[in-house]
């Protein structure tokens, strides 16, 4: 039995021994959900720090202005969030193995989180392009990029809202 399964088992029996029958299931799932969120935050912080350090070094070495604007727009944070959510997606089976009916809920919750993070990543990339061309001071491209980026933001919000609804309802 792995570390997560044994820790989940300890939470399971602790709640079973210390709570009334009507509160056992909600508290077991709630505490295991807090465990999953704790793993997400720890993994996310570690990945953000690591990816930020690597991208900072890469930006300094390359002297590429576009990468510098991507670094300032914190594109690397969205990438770290995506990897953290994907890692937590793999942990669901080990943490909630005694509650198989809750798999679907937590899978949809994490998939919805991935949709939101991916939408934020797309928004940050569009902002990076806009800031890059504003810095280049190419007046015609600035106007075109601003119009395109605003259209992409509106279109992106609609598309990601639809995808989010599909993920939540399992369509």
Where are these regions (language model features)?
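N-terminal membrane topogenic module
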Residues: 1-170
């Amino acid at each position: 039995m792995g570390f997560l399964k044994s820790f989940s088992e300890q939470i399971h029996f602790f709640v079973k021994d210390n709570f009334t029958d009507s509160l056992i299931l909600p508290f077991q799932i709630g505490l295991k959900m807090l465990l999953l969120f704790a793993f997400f935050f720890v993994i996310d912080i570690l990945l953000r720090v690591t990816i930020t350090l690597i991208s900072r070094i890469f930006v300094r070495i390359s002297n590429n202005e576009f990468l510098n604007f991507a670094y300032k727009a914190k594109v690397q944070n969205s990438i770290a969030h995506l990897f953290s959510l994907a890692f937590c997606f793999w942990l669901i089976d080990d943490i909630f193995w005694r509650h198989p009916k809750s798999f679907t809920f937590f899978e949809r919750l994490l998939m919805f989180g991935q949709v939101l993070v991916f939408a934020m990543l797309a928004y940050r990339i569009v902002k990076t392009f806009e800031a890059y061309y504003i810095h280049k001071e190419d007046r015609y491209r600035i106007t075109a990029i601003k119009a395109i980026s605003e259209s992409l933001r509106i279109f992106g919000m609609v598309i990601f809202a639809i995808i989010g609804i599909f993920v939540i309802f399992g369509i």
